[in-house]
Amino acid sequence: LSERWIFLDLDGPVLDVSARYHRVHQDVVQRHGGWPLPRAIYWEAKRNLVAETEILIRCGLSTEAAREAEAQRRLEIERPDHLKLDEPWPWMADVFDELLDLGRLGLVTLRQHRDRLDRQLNALGLHLFFREVVAGPGDGTPEAKAALLRRSGISWGPGSVLVGDTEVDVASGRALGLRTVALGCGIRTPALLAPWSPEALFEDLRQVPSWLEGGERT
């Protein structure tokens, strides 16, 4: 009998990645002679889906320099020294304990470098909580994320759920027949997530265990 799986996206739901994103922003903007945005302003722009090149132009870069800086940003966003800036949300250990009582935990993330991901998970002690880690490069589409899970060989049972912080997570979960939960603590605002009609929309993972338990009682 297939068990219930709770699949979590890493960046946003589990990790606060705003420091890493802002550090890379600072580096590439300064390299091209621009003026980086303050962290709060930069992160709010990212959460509101402002294009990276538009952000870079606001920082004083020419269109050509912005394109170059965006290419450099993509190369550097998973650099090991940058990944060290990521931090689990302070409540994660307690939430993991609650979730593990409700199903098997799987991590699903689009990352270009599996070796760097594994080192990061080990350094943060997160590898201990996940039965499976499903990761691979992607083009940022729901199809790419859904394909990762399809190829994983995991057989999930009724009530399994995908928890993420982007429209890609909601759409990929729906394509796989999973329940979908969107969280507003990551790289999208709740206002941008709501039109994608996730089954539930919460501020962060702390609300998910009670929601899953409520589903068990109905």
Descriptions of predicted regions:
Residues 35, 127-131, 199-202:
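Conserved H-loop
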Residues 13, 20, 113, 168, ...:
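Conserved Rossmann-like nucleotide-cofactor binding loop
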Residues 87-91, 112, 165, 185-188, ...:
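Short beta->alpha linker loops
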Residues 101-103, 154-159, 215:
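Glycine-rich phosphate-binding loop signature in dinucleotide/nucleotide-binding domains
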